[in-house]
Amino acid sequence: MSVDVAIIMGSQSDWETMRHAAHTLEALGISFDARIVSAHRTPDRLVAFAKGAKAEGFKVIIAGAGGAAHLPGMAAAMTPLPVFGVPVQSKALSGQDSLLSIVQMPAGIPVGTLAIGRAGAVNAALLAAAVLALYDEALAARLDEWRKAQTESVAERPSNEA
């Protein structure tokens, strides 16, 4: 059986952010495989992964990277699959460098770019779920339930509790 979503990241330290995508996919019952694929330190691994991702059965790629953040764009350049880029917060510029690197792709090589950090990772997983749900009614129902539960979890009034 193939795995629907690939979560790739440039280094182990990126997992602190990208695990939020994994947890969201798990909550929705979506299969995924998380891998470290550095555009700079393991370029051959990146090429092999990106060129083979569709044949491996992946349907969507979520790519997280910090700093120069070339991973999402380079993956998108080598695969026909949709790639969602998650800028990982960096120490030097708080992830703004990552965001600009991922979002400024040339015409013809799209990367769906999300917010910096945890919110971006969660939203990348939700976008992947929405794409997959176009062809999976059971997943569409789970995604609807997830959104309903999120809505119901928001209090109507502020609380004095910490």
UniProtKB/Swiss-Prot annotation:
Which positions bind substrate? 11, 14, 41
What S-S linkages are listed for this chain? none
Q: Which reaction does it catalyse?
A: 5-carboxyamino-1-(5-phospho-D-ribosyl)imidazole + H(+) = 5-amino-1-(5-phospho-D-ribosyl)imidazole-4-carboxylate
Presence of keyword RNA-binding? no
Q: Which residues form a coiled coil?
A: none
Instruction: Report the pathway entry.
Output: Purine metabolism; IMP biosynthesis via de novo pathway; 5-amino-1-(5-phospho-D-ribosyl)imidazole-4-carboxylate from 5-amino-1-(5-phospho-D-ribosyl)imidazole (N5-CAIR route): step 2/2
Question: InterPro entries, per this entry?
Answer: PurE_ClassI, PurE_dom, PurE_prokaryotes
Q: Which UniProt keywords apply?
A: Isomerase, Purine biosynthesis
**EC nos:** 5.4.99.18
The record's section on Pfam families has: AIRC (PF00731)
What's a single GO BP term from this record? Answer: 'de novo' IMP biosynthetic process
Q: Which GO terms describe its molecular function?
A: 5-(carboxyamino)imidazole ribonucleotide mutase activity
Family classification: Belongs to the AIR carboxylase family. Class I subfamily.
**What biological function has been recorded for the protein in this entry?**
Catalyzes the conversion of N5-carboxyaminoimidazole ribonucleotide (N5-CAIR) to 4-carboxy-5-aminoimidazole ribonucleotide (CAIR).
Protein name (database record)? N5-carboxyaminoimidazole ribonucleotide mutase
Q: Which organism is it from?
A: Brucella suis biovar 1 (strain 1330)
> Which gene is transcribed and translated to give this protein?
purE
